Amino acid sequence: MSDEFSLADALPENSPAKTSAVSNTKPGQPPQGWPGSNPWNNPSAPPAVPSGLPPSATPSPVPFGPTPTGMYPSVPPTGPPPGPPAPFPPSGPSCPPPGGPYPGPGPTGPYPTPNMPFPELPRPYGAPTDPAAAGPLGPWGSMSSGPWAPGMGGQYPTPNMPYPSPGPYPAPPPPQAPGAAPPVPWGTVPPGAWGPPAPYPAPAGSYPTPGLYPTPNNPFQVPSGPSGAPPMPGGPHSYH
């Protein structure tokens, strides 16, 4: 007798729950109706080949070339990648020169006369307008060696106002005493009293004359004593 127990052994022979679909299988085995896609449970199935590189190819950690050999095979090699170097860009301008005839040089020959005079250069004050009218120059530039004439070699123009004459001037007015009104040389003072033309009118209505007002009745009268004022509480008392 086998040690294995199944549901078919516990049911009677004519039980409706016991059908031919129930099989005596082990807990670790799939049912008979499942496809045998697992190569471990189906020894007759061919082994599944993983997708990707073929078994003979060795994966390389670098994106180019064979697997490096040496002390550190996992470190990618340094330096430029193998193969011919990339071509350098051509030297010169980025765009070709324009073709066709080039424009010629500008017009040559006598230029037209300008239609406006040249601006005059700034001159020092007092210098003559015509340069030919200037006096002879000395060894020190603009300083003339001869006597100076009016308008020669001067830096400032001749004044257009004569200097004041040194003639007699009117005497200054005498000093005024402090507090006295200065004389008024212009106009005259009107005669009569100064002030408003008429006195101010008296205020309308009668106002009470200020004086002594009656004292209101005080309900709290202090009785007069022999000394005139009552003794203060806590103060000294006189004993008779």
Curated annotation (Swiss-Prot):
<feature type="modified residue" description="Phosphoserine">
    <location>
        <position position="15"/>
    </location>
</feature>
<feature type="compositionally biased region" description="Pro residues">
    <location>
        <begin position="193"/>
        <end position="202"/>
    </location>
</feature>
<feature type="modified residue" description="Phosphoserine">
    <location>
        <position position="2"/>
    </location>
</feature>
<dbReference type="InterPro" id="IPR031653">
    <property type="entry name" value="MISS"/>
</dbReference>
<feature type="compositionally biased region" description="Pro residues">
    <location>
        <begin position="159"/>
        <end position="185"/>
    </location>
</feature>
<feature type="compositionally biased region" description="Pro residues">
    <location>
        <begin position="74"/>
        <end position="122"/>
    </location>
</feature>
<dbReference type="Pfam" id="PF15822">
    <property type="entry name" value="MISS"/>
</dbReference>
<protein>
    <recommendedName>
        <fullName>MAPK-interacting and spindle-stabilizing protein-like</fullName>
    </recommendedName>
</protein>
<keyword id="KW-0597">Phosphoprotein</keyword>
<feature type="compositionally biased region" description="Pro residues">
    <location>
        <begin position="44"/>
        <end position="66"/>
    </location>
</feature>
<keyword id="KW-0007">Acetylation</keyword>
<feature type="region of interest" description="Disordered">
    <location>
        <begin position="1"/>
        <end position="240"/>
    </location>
</feature>
<feature type="modified residue" description="N-acetylserine">
    <location>
        <position position="2"/>
    </location>
</feature>
<comment type="similarity">
    <text>Belongs to the MISS family.</text>
</comment>
<feature type="modified residue" description="Phosphoserine">
    <location>
        <position position="6"/>
    </location>
</feature>
<feature type="compositionally biased region" description="Polar residues">
    <location>
        <begin position="16"/>
        <end position="26"/>
    </location>
</feature>
<feature type="compositionally biased region" description="Low complexity">
    <location>
        <begin position="34"/>
        <end position="43"/>
    </location>
</feature>
